[in-house]
Amino acid sequence: VWARGQVVVSLKAPNTESIVEYSKTHEKALVDFFVKVEMNRAIEQLQKEYSMVVMDNLKSDLNVMLNAPANFTYYKDTTDFFWSSNNANTGRMDLIVYTFPYTDPNTFTEEYLVAKRDSVLKANLPGSFPGSYMQTETRAGVEYTPITLNGKYCGVMRGLWRMQGDMMGGPFVSHTRLDEKNHRVVVAEGFVYAPETDKRNFMRRIEAALFTLRLPGEFEEPVTETLDIPKEKK
């Protein structure tokens, strides 16, 4: 008997050694599969309950849609830049969406997007102290991975952020898409500040919101993460 919505993977092999070998060979794929299952559950929940503040402002000002968690009620909206947060004392999650013209064929590269991120955040997210601002912590390395969402390219960037001139920092993840109709690049990013606790669940929740980003022409499309099941060992 399984719980509703529970996902079970059965491994069948002629002997224990084969199962161990298969599990070691496909360890990352198996973990990724279950992570994506959890991501789809979070996406499904966000499609049922989400922040109307974020949805309405993004649709009217940037002409995009995104289902942020319902407790994202604090926001700042400027030209081509939107910020929202749950403003929590513990487990703070923030969301930003910004756009810029698509003019450079090297846009979808780690180097370009890190530089663009730093310039945009320096201008739009000042810290609490004079002269402080958010930057990418490049010393820890940044991971850039191209994926396909609903048949279209999306650049996923993961890394750490830090507040220049302050002691704050934490993880971030961003999705970068090309809005072909409007010849612009759209970046949606979530970041977490939770020095007192594990950040994994907060990051997964904010990343689920990024998967709900819809550009003009996609507003009616369903959103899910593609589930890649490891192939059978021959």
PLM region spans:
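Signature of long, low-cysteine stretches enriched in small and polar/charged residues
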Residues: V1-A13, E17, A123-N182, T197, ...
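Extracellular structured ligand-interaction cores
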Residues: Q6, D61-N63, P69-N71, F81, ...
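Short glycine-rich, low-complexity/disordered patches
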Residues: K36-V53, A123-G141, P222-D228
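Long, acidic/polar, low-complexity amphipathic helices and coiled-coil-like
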Residues: V1-K59
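Secretory pathway targeting signatures of secreted, lumenal, and periplasmic proteins
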Residues: P69-S128
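Surface-exposed amphipathic alpha-helical segments
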Residues: E21-E44, L66, F72, V185-K234
